[in-house]
């Protein structure tokens, strides 16, 4: 993990002598703790990763997580009480004057604790942007885990399709999909599965309710697998029965928009130019203004892992970044279509990591 730590330091402009990733209680767990330590399981509430400029990393861990922490092969400092934790943190901070913190993931209470334990002359510097910049470019191990998460989710989607036309509820479809993903090797879902049938498909972040799926429904299914903390994020839209002309037109429009964006996902392209490729196509159709969110986001240890593909981002794409490509069209009262895939930026052509069928399936 030394290379990851060194990369973070290289992306920080300030001359820091220490970086701290400090967890609070669930859900306030900093995924960068796992990035720096290489750990892929455990909760690690109240635990910290202490990074030094030479690439070193040590962990302060509760006794509860000691066995999990040993898998990192990093130096451990184990606490069994809050007093123990305070002593270890004070020792780790001693002598350090310029300390980097991931302020976007650090609670105010945790920051105040750090501030009180550090020397009065210590200065804390927010390195959130540098952390995002570092995590945007994945290493080989990360790409392998994301690919595994994509493979699991893609396979599970195909397995669940025969289950859908049987008059089940949205929640039952979501449960079946999560079951299939875990049966196929996922360590869990990467987020709450979205199953929006009929008019519910017009809500991009609808979850999955008690509505029973009916013949003629168009269904937006947004799902992802977690594989040792790394995420996939895929969306497919299907129809129960034969698709209407309008349903087919919506799907074809979104499919063309996704393909236009995919063709632009190469090193040197800006995020906003990729977004524009999809958005301009939709806005030239009858669905102008119905694409109501950004085109995509980075994925990795988090489903939304930092960078975004949207109309205002100047982010420049680089090899080994992984983004979603997910245009959508939403018509209140009628429904929606979204097609989402996970895309690896390479030195040449982009590559779809997710392989679930993208065509409009009539179930």
What spans do the regions from the language model cover?
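Active-site neighborhoods and metal-handling regions in enzymes and metal-associated proteins
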Residues: 1-363
